[in-house]
């Protein structure tokens, strides 16, 4: 892969984590698909035993004005955060977790023009965190991240916009 390739960057980051002493198991699964998540959990259980914590960072930025957005397009944006969180909750209901971190966005609080689905998905994470903290002993935190400078959806969106402008 090219040095600037997204896959190469991810591989370098994983190798750096491994050099620091972590055991890493990479699994490709759609967090919104319960069957895929059950298969992933089975592999994790076989490799490591019990899960002690979760960092849920899946998401799709989406975009487009609500007046012209289709239900299918909104569902694609909502699914990783809403269905994904619910799937993780169901899948790990019988597991005592030390922590459950949800990577939300400041857009849940501020809103972003043209991203009603993304804002709603992140608001769901915040509400889910509140619910879990009031009904379980698992520390559940929803972090309202702002734009990251070097990684994440915002960087990819800007790169995509740059490519369209250059053409």
Predicted region positions:
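4′-phosphopantetheine-dependent carrier domains
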Residues: 1-167
